[in-house]
From Swiss-Prot:
The modification N-acetylalanine is found at residue 2. GO terms for cellular component: cytoplasm; cytosol; FAR/SIN/STRIPAK complex; membrane; nucleolus; nucleus. ATP binds at residues 30-38, 53, 100-102. This is Serine/threonine-protein kinase 24. A motif (Nuclear export signal (NES)) lies at residues 323-374. Pfam families: PDCD10_N, Pkinase. A motif (Bipartite nuclear localization signal) lies at residues 266-280. Signal peptide: none annotated. The active site is at residue 144. Residues 24-274 form the Protein kinase domain. Its EC number is 2.7.11.1.
């Protein structure tokens, strides 16, 4: 049975005989979190409003470990800055996860009607930092900090959500080296699969600060695979434009390529940008009202179009990815990762369902593999670095997994350029 591992493995699992449909009234769909759909609901025993994430375990069989991880982390958290978890119920193959309802939207939603001012940015960042300070003190790493995973209550309280890729450090394991997160927000050391710790969240926070200021992360116009190559290679992004010096310095402090030079969350709470600008969270209710007005106007415009296909996006627990450039890479078998496979989130997979899948590049077997075998052989003979050759080969296969056919395109472009180069006499000096 698809759900047997979950029955024995989830903390907070309620009496299996209890019927969640009797205990809770499921209301409208309010978003899509990691692994499942999220609904507003009522706890019939207390009349309390809750968020209900419903996951079909038969459809999500491959993600059961990730689901367990999210629930395990949430069940261990007790902080006003982290989404509260109330328990889980199993009915047939459906897992009901009951969580705190946060009706103010995500920080990403709040950017939709227009830019934020620096007081709003500082207030949101301060609350994220409080959540990170708590998690890091518990030796937990969120690993997917971004505006979409920051949720607000209707009163302006700010909480971290979507713990599907969160990691736990132990006393003996002070660093991790797994490749998870969302490409645009990923720290260089995570992409390189070097050992990393809670400072990876600080890098992601710096990217989130740019996102809150500009509406999108750096490189959002590029394919995520390209970004994975650029982040470790390039200088850190900076916040360009008409922003205060303290905000630019806050971003710069977070985005140091050397993790040990990044401040801790506790230290950043004392940064002058936060101290000078952050206000009480009730100040954010103005932003929430602005978003609700904007959404109502959008709904009115959309309803006038018969072929409109817009989905309600009011957030509750679980976060939601609403940009083409937002997807989360989840931890999988390290052996698979070495072979270049990449696991996209449910959202990205759903987006790709209607797109005819291109076949994998023929050149992988006819050109790429033989070429790398030859390179390795030559490198071994002269005592070269096999690791860098394998890393390059892995990167090509990783790109192919994300974008089938890209290797054939790359080889064709290379051939064309070489032909143009030789015709223009570029190779004359070689003769």
């Amino acid at each position: 049975m698809a759900h047997s591992p979950v029955q024995s493995g989830l903390p907070g699992m309620q009496n299996l005989k209890a019927d969640p449909e009797e205990l809770f009234t499921k209301l409208e769909k309010i978003g899509k979190g990691s692994f499942g759909e999220v609904f507003k609901g009522i706890d019939n025993r207390t009349q309390k409003v809750v968020a209900i994430k419903i996951i079909d375990l038969e459809e999500a069989e491959d993600e059961i470990e990730d689901i367990q991880q999210e629930i395990t982390v949430l069940s261990q958290c007790d902080s006003p800055y982290v989404t509260k978890y109330y328990g889980s119920y199993l009915k047939d193959t459906k897992l009901w996860i009951i969580m705190e309802y946060l009706g103010g939207g995500s920080a990403l939603d709040l950017l939709e009607p227009g830019p934020l001012d620096e007081i709003q940015i500082a207030t949101i960042l301060r609350e994220i930092l409080k959540g990170l300070d708590y998690l890091h003190s518990e030796k937990k790493i969120h690993r997917d900090i971004k505006a979409a995973n920051v949720l607000l209550s209707e009163h302006g309280e700010v909480k971290l959500a979507d713990f599907g890729v969160a990691g736990q450090l132990t006393d003996t394991q002070i660093k991790r080296n797994t490749f998870v997160g969302t490409p645009f927000w990923m720290a260089p050391e995570v992409i390189k699969q070097s050992a990393y710790d809670s400072k990876a969240d600080i890098w992601s926070l710096g990217i989130t600060a740019i996102e809150l200021a500009k509406g999108e992360p750096p490189h959002s116009e590029l394919h995520p695979m390209k970004v994975l190559f650029l982040i470790p290679k390039n200088n850190p992004p900076t916040l360009e434009g008409n922003y205060s010096k303290p905000l630019k310095e806050f971003v710069e402090a977070c985005l140091n390529k050397e993790p040990s030079f990044r401040p801790t969350a506790k230290e950043l709470l004392k940064h002058k940008f936060i101290i000078r600008n952050a206000k009480k969270t009730s100040y954010l209710t103005e932003l929430i009202d602005r978003y609700k007005r904007w959404k109502a106007e959008q709904s009115h415009e959309d309803s006038s179009s018969e072929d409109s296909d817009v989905e309600t996006d009011g957030q509750a627990s679980g976060g939601s990815d609403s940009g083409d450039w937002i997807f989360t890479i989840r931890e999988k078998d390290p052996k698979n990762l070495e072979n270049g496979t990449l696991q996209l989130s449910d959202l990205e997979r759903n987006k790709m369902k209607d797109i005819p899948k291109r076949p994998f590049s023929q050149c992988l077997s006819t050109i790429i593999s033989p070429l790398f075998a030859e390179l390795k052989e030559k490198s071994q003979a002269c005592g070269g670095n096999l690791g860098s050759i394998e890393e390059l080969r892995g990167a090509i296969y990783l790109a192919e997994e994300a974008c089938p056919g890209i290797s054939d395109t790359m080889v064709a472009q290379l051939v064309q350029r070489l032909q143009r180069y030789s015709l223009s006499g570029g190779g004359a000096s070689a003769h």
